[in-house]
A protein has these predicted regions:
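N-terminal hydrophobic segments of proteins, predominantly signal-anchor/transmembrane helices
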Residues: 1-17, 24-86, 365, 494, ...
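Loop-to-helix entry and N-terminal half of a specific, functionally important transmembrane alpha helix
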Residues: 2-7, 238, 338-371, 382, ...
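Long extracytoplasmic/lumenal interhelical loops at the membrane interface
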Residues: 12, 251-323, 339-349
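A conserved mid-to-late transmembrane alpha helix and its immediate loop/hinge
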Residues: 159, 163-165, 199-203, 207-208, ...
Length: 513
């Protein structure tokens, strides 16, 4: 899995015969079939409704492409299916405990912080050093260097991603993880410094979509802190958003979505272009609502020369039709609702992990209305989505130990898992080891068990011991005698003066058992 994350940041490409592959696709093509088999067998905390919806989304995409582009079905679905389902199921398989998730958070935060010198150099000089180095390697290709006009006197940082907005989105995903998820296992100084670095790197992408996700996450964090003791604070927030939407709809001659997009851009020209894309995108959706238009070019005004569409959700509806779009959105929304409604009272670590994941994807959901994602970052988005699904079955510290024991005995508990993924999981956990060892105890340490007094406990036998050594005779005297012999022989306590000699025959014993 670490190899997958490295290839997300450094999308090295190469040709394998007629196939154009990159590191992410190669890893996922190798792993998707065994991991998907295990997922459908319920090995990764069960099979959820949204698992089925995501699979149906890809199957419908196959149908839509077969109708529109029959000669490109295998090639396109092979890459899109591997990136979408492969990234999702990889996270479902390897991120299933708090330690796994915290290790992932540390990896992402550290990876972004390490890009700071490269990002500063690129935004000042306009030279993506990492891309230039990759392109010098024999037999290896990298993504194209995207040239844009400078904004605010700075070049947009692309690093090694396919687009500057992808770098900004990668940085924004790590923000809530650094500030919220790691709050119980990191020192405050590290949290604030790393969060500031993440925000600065996100800014250097000079992408309105990425900055929108960052600002929305900061707003949600502030709202949670300000109204932390208010029971219905999130219902209040939904009500405020609804009131704001209604107010804009009544007072503006534009739709609320167009007003929102006009303020979520760096320039009025960009806002105008996105408004036209929205209008003509819906024209294409309604022209082919069932199977979409597939990979065919979309109808648009002559003034829009590029065939790109800066709206991921609209692109899904346009390409695969309303059924494909609906399956994806239902699965996406259902998972967020289920995870968002989980309560982890008494376990601050799980509470902060859940909150950070929900904040991340609430921000990302709005951002995807202003950007499109493809290739490695497309897979990464749904990898991070799958990385939070384990929270649905997670149990807070000290809750239902009997249930936890039964899960461990059946092999479904994360702690009891062993198998082929053990080396990779051990490697990933080492990233979280410093934080976990330095963190305060999540629950009070159990009080030491006092030594049993010889006389006090002789007449008060423990029920579990009696259950382990039942007597064939229900007489109280026989039961006490058998318990005394068992306790003496087992070393559970010292013999009392009234205890029988363990070597004497038992009067209640009628023969071998």
């Amino acid at each position: 899995m670490i190899l997958y994350l490295v290839f997300v940041m450094v999308p090295i490409g190469f040709n394998l015969g007629p196939l154009a592959l990159n590191g992410v696709r190669l890893v996922l093509l190798v792993m998707i079939l065994p991991l998907m088999t295990q997922l459908l067998a319920g090995k990764y905390d069960g099979v959820f409704v949204f698992d089925i919806l995501f699979i149906l989304h890809i199957l419908w995409a196959v149908v839509a492409l077969a109708v529109n582009n029959p000669n490109q079905v295998i090639q396109n679905i092979g890459s899109v299916g591997a990136e979408f389902l492969g990234g999702y199921v990889l996270a479902r398989a390897y991120i299933r405990t708090p330690a796994d998730f915290l290790a992932l958070c540390r990896f992402l935060v550290l990876s972004v912080c390490l890009t700071l010198p490269l990002a500063v150099y690129e935004t000042v000089t306009g030279r993506p050093i990492l891309l230039e180095l990759i392109n010098k390697l024999p037999g290896i290709t990298a993504v194209a260097n995207v040239i844009y006009e400078r904004r605010m006197g700075l070049d947009r940082v692309q690093l090694a991603f396919a687009h500057p907005i992808h770098y900004g989105l990668y940085c924004s995903v790590a923000f809530s993880l650094a500030f919220v998820a790691l709050s119980d296992v990191s020192r405050p100084v590290w949290r604030y410094v790393s969060s500031a670095v993440l925000g600065f790197c996100c800014f250097l992408s000079l992408s309105s979509g990425a900055l929108l996700a960052l600002i929305l996450q900061m707003f949600l964090i502030g709202w949670s802190w300000l109204f932390g003791k208010t029971p219905r604070r999130w219902l209040m927030l939904v009500g405020l958003f609804g009131l704001l939407y209604l107010t804009v709809a009544l007072l503006s001659n534009r739709t609320p979505m167009k007003v929102f997009m006009s303020y979520a851009t760096f320039s009025a020209a960009t806002a105008y272009m996105r408004s036209i894309m929205m209008d003509w995108g819906m024209v294409n959706v309604w022209s082919s609502p069932i199977f979409g238009i597939g990979l065919n070019d979309w109808v648009r005004p002559a003034s829009i020369h590029s065939n790109s569409l800066d709206n991921f959700w609209l692109l899904m509806a346009m390409r695969y039709g309303i059924p494909g779009f609906t399956l994806l959105v239902l699965g996406y929304g259902l998972a967020i609702l289920q995870i968002g409604h989980r309560k982890f009272d008494g376990d601050p670590v799980l509470t902060h992990i859940r909150r950070a994941w929900v904040f991340t994807f609430l921000g990302l959901s709005f951002t995807l209305t202003t950007v499109a994602v493809w290739t490695s970052i497309y897979s990464f988005v749904f990898f991070m989505f799958g990385a939070g699904v384990w929270l649905i079955k997670a149990r807070p510290q000290g809750a239902d130990p009997a249930g936890a024991d039964s899960r461990a005995a059946s092999g479904t508990d994360a702690v009891a898992r062993t198998g082929s993924d053990a080396p990779q999981r051990a490697a990933l956990r080492r990233w979280a080891a410093p934080a976990l060892t330095a963190a305060p105890a999540l629950t009070p340490a159990p009080a030491p068990v006092p030594a049993l007094a010889p006389q006090a406990k002789a007449a008060d036998p423990s029920p579990p011991i009696l259950a382990e050594v039942p007597s064939r005779h229900p007489s109280r005297t026989g039961t006490a005698t058998r318990y005394s012999r068992f306790a003496h022989r087992s070393g559970l306590r010292d013999p009392g003066p009234d205890d029988p000699d363990p070597d004497d025959p038992d009067p209640n014993d009628i023969g071998p058992r």
